[in-house]
């Protein structure tokens, strides 16, 4: 009797996933056509949700294990994907997929490590890098060596992991009886200014004012290096560029005034966009970047902005207009800590604001869900947005 009850419950869950998935397909089609009936919801998260959650990660894998052993990275990513698809509701596909589409994912350190920064591992946090260019002389000597080989150094490891994943797929490897599908690679960028800040420990910010001419040459070197790496990897995996839908990031521009951004970083962004994007680009900026909104609108002509919790969404909509997609920005700490009453209040505040004008708003967190965030908190926010985020 108990077995039959469990079987029915399982069948009902699968049926619920299928119903949800069909609704989600219609929602995104309507959103693409400019006529969604409600506000879509997207959560941004990665396999750090698995690695840094001791309840899920019963083997106790650390990021150092994931970064040194491709089978551990593969396992961590698949465990995360399975958990996400069966526990965290939003407007994505739920349940088992036809194929596991995953990527070689070295978090946010691979570009800095490729340039020479050592990885720094923390027990309860995602990996970071140790700055290695602290002085003008070190930066100058670094540039004198020229742009690194796009497939050497840390990127050699990335390539090895990618080829290992492909080999596993070709061997017929399955997880939960589902085969591997598309294998993604790091063809994008976290942004030239952010990478420059990472590898110099922020010294480049001081250099902008102490020696602007040298700082500008250093930033161009970084941008050119990142661009060459991206071009090589696009070609390696067979992605033709430029293309529609290109998105990049550069979080550390929040440290700059509009004048400094326009002088030192905007030209780098334009070069990257011209190289990889047809049409209008998207950008992820999870800091306090309201001072750059007009420049992003008038100079980069963005079509999409992924925001962090400091962003005033109503201001963003006012400045960017109604034809730019904006995603955000329920505070990650609110989702992590709760209580549900606060989550509900903040969700209602956001979806009831003027950011929804033009029906080009995607509700989500600001930015990137913290490990150990209770799924019930995420699901509560989703249900509130789904119920009250309907357009009339």
Which residues are covered by each model-predicted region?
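Generic hydrophobic, aliphatic-rich segments that mediate packing or membrane embedding
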Residues: 73, 77-80, 138, 157, ...
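Extended interaction regions within the primary functional domain
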Residues: 88-108, 135, 177-185, 239, ...
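Basic, gly/Ser/Thr/Pro-rich low-complexity segments located predominantly at protein N termini
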Residues: 100, 108, 121, 333, ...
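Aromatic- and acidic-residue-enriched carbohydrate-binding clefts of CAZyme catalytic domains
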Residues: 118-138, 246-255, 327-329
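Active-site loop segments of alpha/beta catalytic cores
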Residues: 1-59, 63-66, 144-392
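Membrane helical hairpin/interfacial module
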Residues: 63-117
């Amino acid at each position: 009797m108990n077995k039959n009850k469990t079987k029915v419950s399982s069948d009902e869950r699968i049926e619920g996933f299928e119903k949800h998935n069909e609704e989600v397909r219609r929602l995104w089609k309507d959103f693409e056509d400019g006529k969604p009936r409600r506000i879509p919801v997207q959560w941004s998260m990665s396999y750090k949700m698995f690695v840094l959650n001791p309840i899920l990660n019963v083997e106790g894998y650390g990021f150092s294990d994931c970064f040194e052993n491709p089978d551990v990275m593969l396992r961590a990513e698949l465990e995360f994907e399975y958990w996400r698809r069966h526990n965290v509701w939003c407007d994505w596909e739920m349940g088992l997929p036809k194929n596991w589409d995953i990527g070689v994912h070295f978090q946010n350190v691979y570009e800095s490590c490729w340039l020479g920064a050592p990885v720094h591992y923390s027990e309860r946090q995602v990996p970071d890098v140790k700055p290695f260019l602290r002085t003008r002389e070190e930066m100058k000597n670094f540039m004198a060596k020229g742009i690194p080989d796009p497939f050497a150094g840390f990127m050699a490891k990335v390539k090895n992991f990618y080829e290992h994943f492909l080999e596993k797929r070709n061997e017929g490897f399955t997880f939960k009886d589902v085969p591997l599908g598309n294998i993604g690679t790091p063809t994008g960028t976290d942004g030239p200014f952010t990478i420059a800040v990472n590898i110099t420990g922020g010294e480049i910010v001081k250099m902008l004012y102490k020696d602007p001419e040298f700082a500008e040459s250093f930033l161009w070197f970084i941008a050119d290096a990142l661009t060459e790496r991206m071009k090589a990897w696009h070609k390696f995996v067979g992605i033709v560029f430029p293309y529609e839908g290109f998105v990049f990031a550069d979080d550390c521009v929040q440290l700059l005034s509009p004048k400094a951004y326009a002088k030192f970083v905007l030209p780098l962004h334009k070069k990257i966009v011209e190289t990889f994007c047809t049409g209008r680009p998207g950008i992820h900026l999870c800091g306090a970047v309201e001072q750059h909104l007009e420049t992003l609108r008038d100079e980069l002509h963005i079509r999409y902005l992924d925001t962090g919790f400091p962003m005033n969404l109503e201001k963003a909509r006012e400045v960017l207009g109604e034809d730019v997609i904006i995603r955000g920005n329920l505070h990650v700490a609110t989702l992590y800590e709760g209580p549900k009453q606060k989550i509900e209040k903040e969700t209602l505040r956001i979806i009831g604001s003027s950011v929804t004008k033009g029906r080009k708003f995607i509700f989500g967190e600001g930015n990137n869900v913290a490990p150990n965030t209770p799924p019930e908190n995420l699901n509560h926010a989703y249900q509130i947005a789904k119920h009250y985020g309907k357009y009339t």
